[in-house]
């Protein structure tokens, strides 16, 4: 059965995932597009629901877990959920993992700390660059854009599934790295 109405209660809940308040309340976020969905599944992230349109032609490229519920949606619903001009017709609804502060104890590697970076595109670019450069992770400090903001998620292009990316207090991390004699710049 296909969901065709943008007034459907499920559609309204999915649309709320485009807001920080909605993501926090549902403890989920949305992936928009084939590449992001494939990266999440490849990284064994819990994709609770997969929303696809009848025109989506790449379903055979995706290994879907038995736990993932596949829901057919209309093009109109797809356009109402997406924040892009031309949605690809596939969305993943992903659980936000609870991330406790666990400082690395050895083999720290390089970490990028971002303080007050509010532009989603800039965050995504820096996370992708850190991933490509072999960094261990990225820490978004206070005042930075929300990690699960759809624009940030889209800009990271799946790099968030390759390295650790967390929102946390930078001063604790700086103190930890200095205690370990790791240079902090």
Task: Please report, for each region that a protein language model flagged, where it lies by residue.
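Short acidic-hydrophobic, aromatic-tinged amphipathic segments that line or gate anion-handling sites
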Residues: 2-5, 71-74, 163-173
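Short, aromatic/basic amphipathic alpha-helical patches
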Residues: 58-67
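Boundary-proximal intrinsically disordered activation/regulatory segments immediately upstream
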Residues: 1-58, 144-145
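Glycine/small-residue-rich loop that forms an oxyanion/phosphate-binding "nest" at active or ligand-binding sites
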Residues: 69-95
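RNA substrate-binding interface of SAM-dependent RNA methyltransferases
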Residues: 42, 103-185
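Short, hinge-like loop/turn segments at secondary-structure boundaries
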Residues: 67, 90, 155-159
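Short active-site oxyanion
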Residues: 25-28, 46-49, 67-69, 137-138, ...
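Acidic/glycine-rich phosphate/pyrophosphate-binding loops and surrounding catalytic core
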Residues: 85, 89-90, 94-107, 144
């Amino acid at each position: 059965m296909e969901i065709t109405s943008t007034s459907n209660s499920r559609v309204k809940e999915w649309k709320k995932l485009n807001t920080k308040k909605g993501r926090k309340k549902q403890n989920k976020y949305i992936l928009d597009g084939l590449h992001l969905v494939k990266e999440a599944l490849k990284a064994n992230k819990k994709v609770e629901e997969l929303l696809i349109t009848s025109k989506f032609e790449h379903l055979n490229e995706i290994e879907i877990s038995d736990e993932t519920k596949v829901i057919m949606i209309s093009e109109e619903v797809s356009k109402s959920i997406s924040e892009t001009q031309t949605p690809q017709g596939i969305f993943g609804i992903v659980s936000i993992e609870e991330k406790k502060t666990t400082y690395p104890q050895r083999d720290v590697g390089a970490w990028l700390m971002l303080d007050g970076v509010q532009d989603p595109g800039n965050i995504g670019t820096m996370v992708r660059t850190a991933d490509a450069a072999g960094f261990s992770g990225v820490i978004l400090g206070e005042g930075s854009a929300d990690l699960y903001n759809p624009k940030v998620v889209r800009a990271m292009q799946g790099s968030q599934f390759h390295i650790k990316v967390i929102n946390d207090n930078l001063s604790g991390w700086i103190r930890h790295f200095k205690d370990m004699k790791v240079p902090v710049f």
